[in-house]
Amino acid sequence: MAKKLYIETHGCQMNEYDSSRMVDLLGEHQALEVTARAEDADVILLNTCSIRERAQDRVYSQLGRWRELKLANPEMVIAVGGCVASQEGAAIRDRAPYVDVVFGPQTLHRLPEMIDAARITRLPQVDVSFPEIEKFDHLPEPRVDGPSAYVSVMEGCSKYCTFCVVPYTRGEEVSRPFDDVLSEVIHLAENGVREVTLLGQNVNGYRGTTHDGRVADLADLIRVVAAVDGIDRIRYTTSHPLEFSDSLIQAHAEVPELVKHLHLPVQSGSDRILAAMKRNHTTLEYKSRLRKLRAAVPGISISSDFIVGFPGETEKDFDNTMKLIEDVGFDFSFSFVYSPRPGTPAADLKDDTPEALKKERLAALQHRLNQQGFEISRQMVGSIQRILVTDYSKKDPGELQGRTENNRIVNFRCNNPKLIGQFADVHIDDAQPHSLRGSLLQ
């Protein structure tokens, strides 16, 4: 009987990508098959996120729930990876001594040998080092699960924003070689993938070396990926405004496979707060980039990230953020109350803003962002959208669902499963708060 793997993933798309590669790796080296039930597993993997305090607390809550499983089955291996593992290392076992393996984002390729060593020696295995991009040399070709796929093009970040743990948990920026990324995309396309999302913590900082020694940027990579037979749609995330270049704007204008949607985190509309965050740009510079992009690609959808309640944020600072939202007209975006992360410079800043006021500001900001996003959805009613059909609707098995270029879910009545994995033209009939409804055009 095949041994079972249970994997739980917290956090960003990069973690989702890493988790899929762990499944590939352990399937090839240890013949582990994925199970949906932790109690049936021989190996449990928790891929963690440390971007906010609540996410970190969630890790230990989940590990606590698995403690009884480990007591009932001492042969079970529990492994913790991702950014919490990278940040805390062996200290994880101080709170959860039944954890067998602790590994970082850059050492996931060592999982098979670490699991074997834990079983043989009965000793904990810990490796949270940063061996640059070495892990990709040890991973098998990715399996394909649906028409969309993530492709990691770079790891880490060298921006050192004062609130962010990424440089400390994933290391400095390192780009994958250009040809390695291209080979992965070709493999995915040959196995039915139609849409790829190029991933990096600062993806527009990509600088990949080609086989002839040249250095290619993200715009170069996008143009070559677009030429791969079978790839009809390209996304990328997450970007930094400082490196949103003219060449990338030109790619948006000239490459039809590149979607008319950009996620460009700004974090705040206050120049004073942006300086304290060490974002190294102003709101004027941010808006200038977007004006240039919208001139090149009319109708492009812009989403962003916002942090409310950064230490020292005044009412005027928050008002400036709300003004930026009005000036730009964002699509649905992500926003959070600031969460101090240990080891980051911002964690040492004085913070005298009451928590209740932070939550009040967040609610106001989210309300306006949702209004703007819903207005964009309503403007799409009556239009014909080309969507990539991804699966059956989660609520109605008589419906299929897919995504538009601007990343909206569309549900439409259709009982033809052969449409899954294909593009279809759908007339948008109605806008709902978090999705669209449409009719398939024959």
UniProtKB/Swiss-Prot annotation:
Binding sites annotated in the UniProt record for [4Fe-4S] cluster 2: 157, 161, 164
GO molecular function, one term: N6-isopentenyladenosine methylthiotransferase activity
Keywords: 4Fe-4S, Cytoplasm, Iron, Iron-sulfur, Metal-binding, S-adenosyl-L-methionine, Transferase, tRNA processing
GO cellular component: cytosol
Transmembrane residue ranges: none
Subcellular location as annotated: Cytoplasm
Names of required cofactors: [4Fe-4S] cluster
Cofactor notes: Binds 2 [4Fe-4S] clusters. One cluster is coordinated with 3 cysteines and an exchangeable S-adenosyl-L-methionine.
Principal place of residence: cytoplasm
Record-annotated disulphide pairs: none
SMART domains cross-referenced by the UniProt entry: Elp3 (SM00729)
EC number: 2.8.4.3
Entry superkingdom: Bacteria
Binding site for [4Fe-4S] cluster 1: 12, 49, 83
Domain TRAM: 378-442
Domain called Radical SAM core: residue spans: 143-375
A Pfam family per the record: TRAM
UniProt domain MTTase N-terminal: residue ranges: 3-120
Catalytic activity: N(6)-dimethylallyladenosine(37) in tRNA + (sulfur carrier)-SH + AH2 + 2 S-adenosyl-L-methionine = 2-methylsulfanyl-N(6)-dimethylallyladenosine(37) in tRNA + (sulfur carrier)-H + 5'-deoxyadenosine + L-methionine + A + S-adenosyl-L-homocysteine + 2 H(+)
Record text on subunit structure and interactions: Monomer.
Function: Catalyzes the methylthiolation of N6-(dimethylallyl)adenosine (i(6)A), leading to the formation of 2-methylthio-N6-(dimethylallyl)adenosine (ms(2)i(6)A) at position 37 in tRNAs that read codons beginning with uridine.
Record NCBIfam families: miaB-methiolase, MiaB/RimO family radical SAM methylthiotransferase
Family assignment from sequence similarity: Belongs to the methylthiotransferase family. MiaB subfamily.
Name this protein carries in UniProt: tRNA-2-methylthio-N(6)-dimethylallyladenosine synthase
Source organism (scientific name): Pseudomonas savastanoi pv. phaseolicola (strain 1448A / Race 6) (Pseudomonas syringae pv. phaseolicola (strain 1448A / Race 6))
Protein encoded by which gene: miaB
